């Protein structure tokens, strides 16, 4: 769990200095088409200015669209691309503080005091970045796992951030329904 320095800086600005209403209204202005080369701090940092009004969202749009698109494209670059590619967005963590090893990290992300803000960030990145990934020769199916594990049912989780057997079943059924 060691994020890149740019990820930390952009998340701090979003959590501490950016109102929810600003995040709700943020749209990407443009896509920075280059993948990063420097510990996640190359072109991703330039992407900060590619979203408005919450400019730091540009960094996360770049990470979850440009970088994932490049990764998946490279991973499937053989002679035959798959017909369909499912790209999943993370589920929301459990909202209950349960004494988990993840409580401290979730607290630093503001999740213990205001889970709606991090949930909004996850949803916006899914809508504006993950849902816009294109892979030549394949149908990309965006999968919002946060629609299944929404953070409200503690029994769906182990340690707040991992699915329990019950949560895993819910995700598996969601994926099966999708395909």
Question: What does each model-found stretch correspond to?
Answer:
Residues 88-92, 144-147:
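Short, well-ordered beta-to-alpha junction loops that form the rim of enzyme active sites
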Residues 55, 59-62, 66, 76-84:
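A short helix->loop->beta-strand "cap" motif at the edges of active sites that frequently abuts
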Residues 155-179:
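Histidine-centered active-site loop/cap adjacent to the catalytic His
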Residues 1-59, 91-101:
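Oxyanion-hole/transition-state-stabilizing segment in secreted/luminal serine hydrolases
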């Amino acid at each position: 769990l060691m994020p890149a320095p740019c990820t930390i800086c952009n998340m701090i600005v979003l959590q501490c200095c950016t109102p929810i209403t600003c995040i709700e209204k943020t749209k990407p202005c443009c896509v920075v088409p280059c993948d990063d080369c420097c510990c996640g701090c190359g072109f991703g940092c330039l992407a900060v200015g590619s979203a408005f009004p919450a400019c730091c969202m540009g960094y996360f749009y770049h990470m979850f669209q440009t970088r994932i698109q490049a990764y998946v494209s490279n991973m499937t670059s053989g002679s035959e691309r798959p017909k369909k590619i499912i790209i999943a967005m993370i589920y929301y963590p459990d909202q209950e503080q349960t004494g988990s090893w993840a409580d401290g990290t979730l607290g630093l992300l503001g999740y213990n005091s205001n889970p709606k803000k991090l949930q909004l960030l996850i949803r916006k990145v899914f809508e504006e970045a993950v849902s816009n990934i294109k892979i030549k020769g394949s149908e990309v199916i965006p999968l919002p796992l946060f629609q299944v594990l929404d953070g409200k049912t503690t029994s769906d989780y182990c340690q707040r951030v991992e699915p329990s057997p019950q949560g895993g079943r819910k995700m598996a059924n969601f994926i099966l329904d999708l395909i």
